[in-house]
A protein has these predicted regions:
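ATP-dependent small-molecule kinase phosphotransfer cores
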Residues: 1-65
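A generic secondary-structure signal
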Residues: 27-30, 66-70, 119-120, 152
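Short loop/turn elements that form and flank the Walker-type P-loop nucleotide-binding site
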Residues: 33-34, 76, 125-126
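Hydrophobic/aromatic beta-strand patches that form the interior of the parallel beta-sheet core
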Residues: 40, 79-81, 130-132
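Anionic group-transfer/hydrolysis microenvironments
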Residues: 43, 86, 135
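A glycine- and Lys/Arg-enriched "phosphate-lid" helix/loop adjacent to the NTP-binding pocket
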Residues: 47-115
Length: 155
């Protein structure tokens, strides 16, 4: 995908749309008396944000139409938490993860993704969003940073 996005973008985005719909449907079907909430590391709108960046205009119009049809009855979260990382930190994480197919991702693409998220958040004030900049934090290796992130979420 990263080497020929124009060729693969629509097929890939449609695949993600179907996969995320299945995941969220499965998660929502498992709510019961003992578990009345879901914590997730993604939201369905992630698909819309990425597709706006990767698809050409005609493809995006079609994708967006299908997206809203598929997700029209899916409940929205009470709170979104966006853990922002600047492009340099994202590139560091990609290098550390070591996946060969990600190593060629250009910083301009990551800039577009960051801008896409922030623009989406700005254009949807009806969503309850908390943005936490973790560019200079390592909550995996550093307990103080982990506790700081939890404090930010709860404040």
């Amino acid at each position: 995908f990263y080497e020929d996005a124009t060729r693969y973008a629509f097929t890939l985005e449609m695949s993600f749309l179907a996969d995320r719909y299945q995941q969220i449907s499965d998660d929502l079907s498992q709510l019961d008396l003992f578990k009345d909430f879901i914590v997730s590391d993604y939201d369905v709108f992630k698909s819309l944000i990425f597709s706006k960046i990767t698809l050409n205009e005609d493809e995006f119009v079609l994708y967006r139409k299908l997206f809203y049809q598929v997700y029209k009855d899916i409940a929205r979260p009470d709170l979104y938490i966006y853990l922002y990382q600047n492009t340099e930190r994202l590139q560091d994480n990609i290098r550390l993860r070591g996946r060969d197919y990600e190593q060629t991702i250009e910083s301009s693409y990551l800039d577009k993704i960051n801008t896409g998220y922030l623009t989406f958040i700005k254009n949807h004030p009806e969503f309850n969003v908390k943005i936490i900049d973790i560019s200079n934090r390592d909550f995996i290796k550093n307990r103080v940073d982990y506790l700081w992130v939890l404090e930010q979420i709860c404040s």
